[in-house]
């Protein structure tokens, strides 16, 4: 079992635990008299498996632990306050008290809604996650950020509150789709660009490229399961280290936003375009992050942060070999509004994270218009 401890505050702590199967987490749930399971309908099989295990233990031990469950459709359009209120209404209807545990099983949308609802219901309910996508295992479920979208803007409303547990389960890699894998791989590469301990960036590019070039990509993911788990744990470890030193994102934690200012603007523009045209050209968060990092790499060279004139091209070539997009489908000017409303904007300046080299990033405060002008000229 791999265990990482993140100190949350003087009263609580948050643990990341790697367990073999989803039923192995039951031993960590013994102290909770009631468990409320919120799960993505697409991973119903995992939720059912866990609930059945808890009920089996109840039957053999005579325990009276009760389990209630609530299925949600985990789509970006559902990542809003209405969904959070639905969960709170369900908890209230079931008379959930503050001794209970809210357990979210699913990807980043599910963990965000779980954490947000638990943060505000009765001023705080204990909660835990079973992230079922690579992206949520290495990023979304770690660190205590719980956010939902508002007026199409990404994660505009939210809380910072740590889950008591994050259970990382390799079993979920057996059923992960290739698109989800690609989305998660972008967040892993982002993490290793920030901190390239043990040359994990190069290792990740090699494994992801082999999977992408395979004729049967889904089978290839399973074939490289051992290597992927090592990379997942490494990425989770890096993020946990950073969060433990800067819970409220006052300094070092901002590094984890590499590519995200551009990514959130691209996601916002994609959502807006779909609403205007009735289209369904959805860009996943990981795909947008890959594009955002590529733009950040170009910008880093243009303003002299990165002295290596080949770095941006090398990163983009690496990303393409891993099956990731590197070019934005939208004109830079169309991203201005979303970037100005980004959470990282203060006094008209955005905290951009730029790349000095693989393993070293820096923060630079820049005006949105200046950045977009540079990007436009570089096209």
In which residue ranges do the predicted regions lie?
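Short glycine/serine/threonine-rich phosphate/pyrophosphate-binding segments
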Residues: 109-116, 137, 264-265
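C-terminal charged capping/lid subdomain of soluble metabolic enzymes
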Residues: 186-188, 305-379
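Active-site segments that bind and position negatively charged phosphate/pyrophosphate groups
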Residues: 213-333
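Hydrophobic/aromatic beta-strand patches that form the interior of the parallel beta-sheet core
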Residues: 68-70, 103, 128-130, 165-168, ...
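Glycine-rich beta-strand-to-loop/alpha-helix junction loops that act as flexible
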Residues: 74-75, 105-107, 258-259
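A glycine/threonine-rich phosphate-anchoring loop and its flanking beta-alpha core
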Residues: 9, 116-211
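ATP/NTP phosphate-donor binding region
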Residues: 1-101
């Amino acid at each position: 079992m791999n265990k990482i401890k993140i100190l949350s505050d003087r009263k609580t702590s948050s643990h990341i635990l790697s367990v073999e199967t989803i039923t192995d987490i039951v031993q960590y749930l013994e102290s909770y008299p009631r468990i409320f399971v919120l799960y993505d309908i697409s991973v119903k099989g995992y939720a059912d498996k866990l609930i059945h295990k808890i009920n089996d233990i109840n039957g053999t031990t005579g325990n009276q632990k009760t389990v209630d469950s609530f299925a949600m459709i985990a789509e970006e359009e559902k990542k809003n306050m209405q969904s959070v209120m639905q969960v709170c209404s369900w908890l209230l209807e079931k008379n959930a008290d503050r001794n209970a545990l809210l357990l979210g099983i699913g990807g980043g949308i599910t963990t965000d809604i779980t954490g947000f609802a638990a943060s505000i219901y009765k001023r705080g309910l204990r909660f835990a996650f079973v992230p079922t996508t690579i992206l949520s295992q290495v990023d979304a479920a770690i660190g205590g950020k719980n956010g939902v979208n508002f007026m199409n803007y990404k994660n505009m409303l939210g809380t910072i509150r740590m889950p008591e547990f994050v259970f990382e389960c390799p079993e979920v890699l057996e059923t992960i789709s290739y698109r989800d894998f690609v989305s998660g791989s972008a967040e892993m590469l982002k993490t290793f660009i920030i901190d390239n301990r043990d040359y994990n960036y190069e290792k990740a590019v090699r494994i992801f490229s082999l999977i992408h070039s395979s004729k049967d990509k889904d089978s290839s993911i399973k074939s490289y399961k051992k290597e992927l788990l090592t990379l997942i744990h490494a990425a989770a470890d890096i993020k946990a280290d950073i969060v433990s030193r800067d819970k409220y994102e006052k300094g070092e934690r901002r590094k984890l936003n590499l590519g995200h200012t551009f990514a959130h603007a691209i996601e916002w523009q994609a959502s807006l375009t779909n609403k205007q045209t009735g289209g369904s050209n959805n860009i996943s968060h990981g795909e947008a992050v890959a594009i955002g990092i590529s733009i950040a790499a170009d910008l880093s060279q243009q303003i002299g942060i990165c002295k290596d004139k080949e770095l941006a091209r090398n990163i983009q070539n690496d990303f393409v070999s891993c099956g990731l997009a590197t070019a934005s489908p939208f004109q830079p000017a169309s991203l201005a509004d979303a970037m100005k409303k980004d959470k990282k904007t203060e006094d008209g300046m955005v905290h951009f994270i730029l790349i000095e080299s693989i393993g070293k990033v820096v923060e630079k405060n820049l005006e949105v218009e200046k950045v977009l002008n540079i990007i436009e000229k570089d096209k």
